[in-house]
Amino acid sequence: MNVPHPHRPSLWLNARLATMDPAHGAPYGALEGHALLLRDGHIEAVLPQAEADAAAFDGEVFDLQGRWVTPGFVDCHTHLVYGGSRAAEWEKRLTGVPYQQIAAEGGGIVSTVRATRWLDEEELALASLPRLKALMAEGVTTVEIKSGYGLTLADELKQLAAARRLQASLPVEVATTLLAAHAVPPEYAGDADGYVDLVVESILPVAARAGLAEAVDAFCESVGFSPAQTRRVFEAARAHGLKVKGHVEQLSNLHGAELVAEFGGLSADHIEYLDDAGVAALKRAGTVAVLLPGAFYFLRETQKPPVDKLRAAGVPMAVSTDLNPGTSPFASIRLAMNQACVLFGLTPEEALAGVTRHAAQALGRGATHGRLAAGCVADLLVWDIAHPAELAYSVGVPLLKQRVFRGAAQHID
């Protein structure tokens, strides 16, 4: 299969499309025997094969020979820009050493903060590059990257700048999120309110003015920040024109999802302890529920998110890797899909929607990403599969034939 020139229009024939567009009604939004017309980095048309006049087309023509095509994957929740490793800490925990002892010895999130602060922007981007490339190799074309391991003005900005540097060097779209309210740094031990002052009065305004973040996140949890502190962060985000999202209801129910919904948040993430009021709030606000099965698995949790209630209420469910060094060190979007099915009870179709249409919605990109539809960006994946369910069924099997970003393709073979 040839690789199209990135600046020329292209016509992709003989495709089986998993459009993930509910307008088509069929499972996966499937269209058999169709063609895609790509121009200027966007999908210009999705048309039946019989209407695709290859002979008269003024660009490049490619025969997909009946292969399945999906939208490019969207990984809507990652912490992939960081320094260091927590493998030794994980090994200790497996042998029975309590987390409190590890933290007292300088481990835990503080060790990642220390390692991240030690690296400069270029070094941080280089350290994170293999993780991003691993996601791209499985079909990720858009990825969210959070800060949250700097916890000072300079280091939070450095993380966001490193994420932007990665976007500039690779064919991938990066959505940056400020997560300064991730943990209380050592300098503010015992003074969470004082640290929140720093976030809302300094870190967040500077990041907003610099254009380094498009959204603001906060870890609303008993071991993170209280609902009142989270509200302060969200109010500051709104004042600076930034969208909000939240790490909520992961370990307990502090009604953080309702707070996210109150601010019209893009997404409520983790949500293992989400209750009926939280489900209703997400539905009313149009907020996406982001499921993170990797962290659930890695931490050996037992409380599952209320998938049946979310499904019944019609709350869109996204699926993401939560790639991070402490609780989900997995750079595999297809593993997350498999885990969402096996651990949380999603169907393969729901899992695929979770890394395409709904994940795009969780990043405020629902109108332009995550579907094969006219007007959407020309980010698409060509697969060697017999059925779309295979994408969530197997892990580690290289199924991706071609990754197309804004109309330009790369061979995966």
From Swiss-Prot:
Major localisation: cytoplasm
GO cellular component terms attached to this protein's record: cytoplasm
User: What EC number(s) is this enzyme filed under?
Assistant: 3.5.2.7
Lineage top rank: taxon: Bacteria
Catalyzed chemical reaction(s): 4-imidazolone-5-propanoate + H2O = N-formimidoyl-L-glutamate
Q: Which molecular function term from Gene Ontology is one that the record holds?
A: iron ion binding
What cofactor is this protein dependent on? Zn(2+); Fe(3+)
Q: Where does 4-imidazolone-5-propanoate bind?
A: R86, Y149, H182, Q250, T327
Please name the pathway: Amino-acid degradation; L-histidine degradation into L-glutamate; N-formimidoyl-L-glutamate from L-histidine: step 3/3
Q: Where are the transmembrane segments?
A: none
Location(s) in or outside the cell: Cytoplasm
Cofactor: bound how, per the entry note?
Binds 1 zinc or iron ion per subunit.
Quote the record's binding site residues for Fe(3+).
Answer: H77, H79, H247, D322
* UniProt entry tagged with the keyword Transferase: no
**Keyword Flavoprotein recorded:** no
Q: Where does Zn(2+) bind?
A: H77, H79, H247, D322
Biological process terms in GO annotation = L-histidine catabolic process to glutamate and formamide; L-histidine catabolic process to glutamate and formate
First-tier enzyme category under EC: hydrolase
- Family, per the entry? Belongs to the metallo-dependent hydrolases superfamily. HutI family.
Q: What does the UniProt record say this protein does?
A: Catalyzes the hydrolytic cleavage of the carbon-nitrogen bond in imidazolone-5-propanoate to yield N-formimidoyl-L-glutamate. It is the third step in the universal histidine degradation pathway.
Q: What is this protein called?
A: Imidazolonepropionase
Gene of this entry:
hutI
